[in-house]
Amino acid sequence: MRSKVTGAKRWVVKIGSALLTADGKGLDRGAMAVWVEQMVALREAGVELVLVSSGAVAAGMSQLGWTKRPSAMNELQAAASLGQMRLVQAWESSFGEHGKHTAQILLTHDDLSDRKRYLNARSTLRTLVDLGVVPVINENDTVVTDEIRFGDNDTLAALVANLVEADLLVILTDRDGMFDADPRNNPEAQLIYEARADDPSLDAVAGGTGGALGRGGMQTKLRAARLAARSGAHTIIIGGRIERVLDRLKAGERLGTLLSPERGMLAARKQWLAGHLQTRGTLVLDAGAVQALRQANKSLLPVGVKTVQGSFRRGEMVVCVGPDGVEVARGLANYSALEAQKIIGQSSEAIESILGYSAEPELVHRDNLVLV
């Protein structure tokens, strides 16, 4: 299983705020230098590398003399705008000592939700990697709104792994990995070395929240691993305080928790759909429709839909759930929620007589649908 790590050619590495700051007292240049040494070694070993770096808000808080992460959006954005410049300067300076360059990429959810912007971002990232530049990615905290937040950089890293078709996502954290119990309370807790990302038993052991400087706890890291798995990437959740951890991962040491995907790489359009987190509504399917999607790779027809929830327009993303409420798929709707309400449970031939026109015979076409 660890051959999936040593043989991975394209890595996305996510480093959290706690690993880049000196106990909340600004950026830790010494720690950043050690990370850079390891990432440069990966590049020289032929690994294509994309860095997702937290730390902008924490760096800005330090500059402003704040010791507690603010909850108000305007204060967070002010700290991010101040700290982002210092964060990028620090990475560029450190990589520059090894003759490498970095490029700043700031993303919002809209950049990945829009197909054209998604493709432009992917093209830019691939070009930078081909040029030997290390892209440094962060959420564009300064302009983002609650409605289009990724929520945490673990999720952003997973979507970037999807975007660049990475083989491996490395999420560096303040824990050594995922444990079968909370090691802070249970000295008998055992590290989970390997598991399937979709293993439901992991949910019970992924409790807890992020630290004072960051947003993501173990639950968000598990969720990120599952997002990355949709595009065929493996994920390592591993302690960032383990000495030379990236070097040792590349050498094949059995460290951290390796979460593996159920399926292989999806086609490019399906990758975009799988990583499209902003959903506008829900379609509740009957058992026959669930079977048609899962076993026969069929489109979703109106006759197989029992209920429409939410408000969405034609072309927006909807979630498809079975009678038990479990998500089956997600895809782009051919009809608005109002139109869908009128045609569900009906045959495709009846659409025109009900609506006065027929855009498509399917509610969601299979080319715009991805199983989850």
Swiss-Prot record:
Keyword Cytoplasm tagged: yes
SMART domains: PUA (SM00359)
EC number: 2.7.2.11
Enzyme class: transferase
Pfam family, one: AA_kinase
Source species: Pseudomonas putida (strain ATCC 47054 / DSM 6125 / CFBP 8728 / NCIMB 11950 / KT2440)
Pathway: Amino-acid biosynthesis; L-proline biosynthesis; L-glutamate 5-semialdehyde from L-glutamate: step 1/2
Protein's UniProt name: Glutamate 5-kinase
Cross-referenced SUPFAM superfamilies: Carbamate kinase-like, PUA domain-like
GO terms of biological process kind: L-proline biosynthetic process
Chain positions recorded as substrate binding sites: S54, D141, N153
